[in-house]
A protein has these predicted regions:
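Flexible loop and strand-edge segments within Gram-negative outer membrane beta-barrel domains
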Residues: 24, 207-228, 234-295, 301-319
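N-terminal periplasmic "start-of-domain" segments of outer-membrane beta-barrel proteins
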Residues: 35-68, 96, 137
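N-terminal periplasmic accessory domains that precede
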Residues: 73-76, 95-98, 125-130, 139, ...
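Extracytoplasmic beta-strand/coil segments of soluble accessory domains associated
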Residues: 74-115
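Short acidic/polar hinge/loop motifs at secondary-structure boundaries
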Residues: 114-141, 229, 463
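Membrane-embedded beta-barrel scaffold of Gram-negative outer-membrane proteins
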Residues: 294-308, 426, 434, 467-525
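Gram-negative outer-membrane beta-barrel transporters
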Residues: 394-397, 495-499, 519-604, 682-684
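C-terminal beta-signal and adjacent terminal beta-strands/loops
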Residues: 543, 594-603, 628-685
Length: 685
């Protein structure tokens, strides 16, 4: 036992030596929503399960995360048919989740049921959550619950970290791949008493060498070095529960032209220096154990600092966020649950940039465009207090209905109303039908959220009067549990429709000289249909097959044309197989993906008369595989990703002239790197 205290203290001292600490731990929600409960099954523990409440979604546990390298949150959905993770930019490595055919700005990101990763963190947040830190992920589709705010339009992704109160142990995870990337992770927790526990989480990663495998003179992916640390505490008494923690992150990304192939003093360089600090606390006062009556106060704060250079464009940011929520919840009986709460969210973005943008009139700056040589201050802020009420009716296992409303007041946009409704009906145990309808809103801090677009040679033109994004989402899903040959076939089919009333449109089509962001003038919608099935074919062998069809369109060119959303695949097919030997010593996992083609932005004519790029991109396949050998206190794994070796032929257009308007690295629709092999070891004691 004392060795664990010593190791935990050593890890804490090492973290303090690495850099100053503050932040990101989130606690697992003291009072989880009913929809976050999982269906329990017997036999080999499945890596995913359906959420048991009225909200449609899935829960992903560590068994699923172990099926791939899963170095961070962005690499945790390789085997998931519902969630796509795509690169937005070949030079910065910006990546976003796509859910229901729409980008991650419409997916509310939570860490242990606290809103997180806003503004400038959005393009890079998937790399801020190390995979070995995660205990599980819940993906809710549609408008989700009103408890956590109004921002969920296509869904919520909630990350649960390893907990201080988990079984005491020390874990170490080491990883390396053939692209010169190395990672080291460590975590340790100690039970200080029967009520108090603490843990330390450490992460370091480094890409030791840049690569230019396609010979275009630019690095295929940015160099990246990251330090990440969290310290978390928990107290669990009979009538009072506390969770709290601090965390800090430091990351440096470097990219641009390969200096070995460019003999010039005028090298195009990209540098992003990020410092992020977070802190949170949760207090739960249990008033009545029999009825689950409790009052809870939750609060989180973060500061995100970014110092960025994109060629001769510069962007500096100091972003601060404060969120607090006071909640009351009780079960009047086994059938009736009521949740009430108030919350406040405050965002402040202090920015400096030398780009052509038009800020909101509330900032008090002139409307005239800025010269490239001028650094301008662009300060934005919003405070949004609100209140919600949510009622849940449960009739045994047959029916669960949840209705919630929010009323919020934005210091920019005034009052707005958020209704949401979910129902689950099970006529028999083998069938579940879910319906949902709800509204969601997003405030757009365009320059922060789309700062990776500054790497383009085009000018970035942001409208000065962007409205709050506003959309309705409707969903229908059915789940079948079909007995077949002594086992159960799990079959799921779902359809979702998202319709925007207001949207910040990112337009590549209107003008070859600029990328424009402006208010929607016309229609914008997404239709998504998905069917998936899983079956334990043999003892220890689980297979999953899925197909998803997307129809995503938006009105571009300032209201002139309703077109397919660019860089969005029309469909996706996925097949996974996972086999674990009877004694559990060996595990074999494989995933095959077929990603459909889609539309590229409107091309234009180059000086030589040729088109800048093809009007459409084609479908492509990807294969990944991993073999794991399990031992009592450790495991070793080897694998490969993108084994088909497919790469987008031209991830950077105009690479030979990076200082011109033809330079375009942000039109990424496929892999930018070829085959990659990796190996790692996990040790716990």
């Amino acid at each position: 036992m004392y060795s664990r205290y010593i190791l935990t203290g050593a890890l804490l001292m090492l973290a303090l030596k690495g850099y100053s600490q503050t932040d990101t731990a989130s606690l697992d929600s003291v009072f989880k929503d009913e929809e976050l409960k999982e269906v329990k099954v017997v036999a080999r523990k499945p890596g995913t399960s359906r959420l048991a409440g009225a909200v449609n979604g899935i829960a992903v546990n560590k068994d699923e995360l172990f099926k791939a390298a899963c170095c961070n949150l962005g690499e945790s959905f390789t085997t998931n048919p519902s969630v796509d993770v795509a690169y937005n930019d070949a030079t910065t490595g910006a990546r976003q989740i796509k859910l229901l055919g729409l980008s991650g700005t419409y997916v509310q990101m939570l860490t242990e049921n606290l809103p997180n990763f806003r503004g400038a963190a959005i393009p890079y947040a998937l790399g801020y959550v190390p995979g070995p830190w995660m205990k599980g992920i819940q993906v809710s589709k549609g408008s989700a619950s009103v408890k956590n705010g109004y921002e969920s339009i296509t869904g919520q992704i909630n990350v649960d970290y390893l907990q201080p109160e988990d079984e005491q142990q020390v874990e170490v995870n080491l990883f390396g791949d053939t692209k010169s990337r190395i990672e080291a992770n460590a975590d340790a927790n100690v039970h200080l008493s029967d009520k108090w526990a603490t843990e330390i989480l450490l992460h370091h990663e480094n890409i030791l060498q840049n690569h230019d495998d396609n010979g275009d003179g630019f690095y295929d992916m940015p160099g990246r070095e990251q330090y990440n640390v969290q310290n978390r505490w928990v107290y669990k008494g009979k009538n009072y529960i506390f969770h709290g923690g601090l965390g800090a992150l430091k990351e440096i990304r470097t990219s641009g032209q390969d200096t070995e192939h460019v003999h010039s003093d005028d090298i195009y360089r990209i540098k992003l220096h990020t410092n992020r600090y977070e802190g949170y606390m949760k207090h739960a006062f249990i008033l009545n154990h029999e009825h689950g009556t409790n009052i809870a106060f939750m609060s989180s704060a973060s500061m995100h600092q970014l110092d960025a250079q994109y060629g001769n464009k510069f962007y500096d940011l100091n972003e601060k966020n404060l969120y607090s929520s006071l909640m009351f919840e009780t079960n009047f009986s086994t059938q009736h649950n009521l949740s009430l709460g108030v919350s406040v969210n405050h965002d402040y973005l202090g920015q400096r940039a030398n780009v052509n943008v038009s800020p909101r009139p509330t900032v008090g700056l002139e409307e005239s465009p800025y010269l490239l040589s001028d650094m301008q201050r662009i300060n934005e802020k919003e405070t949004t207090p609100g209140a919600y009420a949510q009622y849940t009716y449960t009739l045994g296992t047959k029916l669960t209905a949840m209705a919630g409303v929010r009323i919020d007041h934005s210091s920019i946009y005034g009052n707005f109303f958020t209704p949401r409704f979910h129902v689950k009906y099970s006529p028999i145990d083998a069938i579940s039908i879910r319906l949902s309808a709800g509204k969601g809103y997003c405030t757009v801090f365009a320059l922060a959220e789309y700062n990776y677009l500054l790497s383009s040679g085009r000018n970035l033109n942001i409208s000065k009067d962007l409205k709050q994004e506003e959309a309705w989402n409707y969903g229908l899903s059915t789940a079948f549990y079909i007995p077949m040959f002594g086992k159960t076939l799990k079959l799921n089919a779902e359809y979702y429709y998202t319709s925007f009333e207001n949207q910040a449109v990112v337009d590549y089509d209107a003008n070859k000289e600029l990328i424009a962001i402006y208010n929607l003038r016309g229609k914008s919608y997404s239709h998504t249909f998905q069917i998936d099935a899983s079956y334990p074919l043999l003892r220890g062998l689980e297979i999953t097959a899925a197909y998803r069809l997307n129809d995503v369109k938006c009105t571009y060119d300032y209201g002139k044309s309703l077109m397919e959303k660019p860089l969005t695949s029309k469909y996706k097919a996925l097949f996974t197989a996972s086999y674990k030997t009877p004694l559990g010593l060996w595990q074999f996992d494989a995933t095959v993906q077929l990603n459909g083609g889609g539309r590229n932005p409107e091309s234009y004519q180059l000086a030589d008369g040729s088109p800048s790029w093809s009007p459409r991109f084609h479908s492509f396949e990807q294969v990944s595989a991993q073999v794991t050998r399990w031992f009592r206190h450790w495991s070793i794994y080897v694998g490969g990703e993108n084994l088909t070796g497919f790469k987008q032929k031209t991830p950077i257009y105009g690479a030979s002239t990076p200082w011109g308007s033809d330079f375009e690295p942000t039109l990424v629709w496929g892999p930018v790197e070829g085959r990659m092999f990796y190996a790692g070891v996990r040790v716990h004691f």
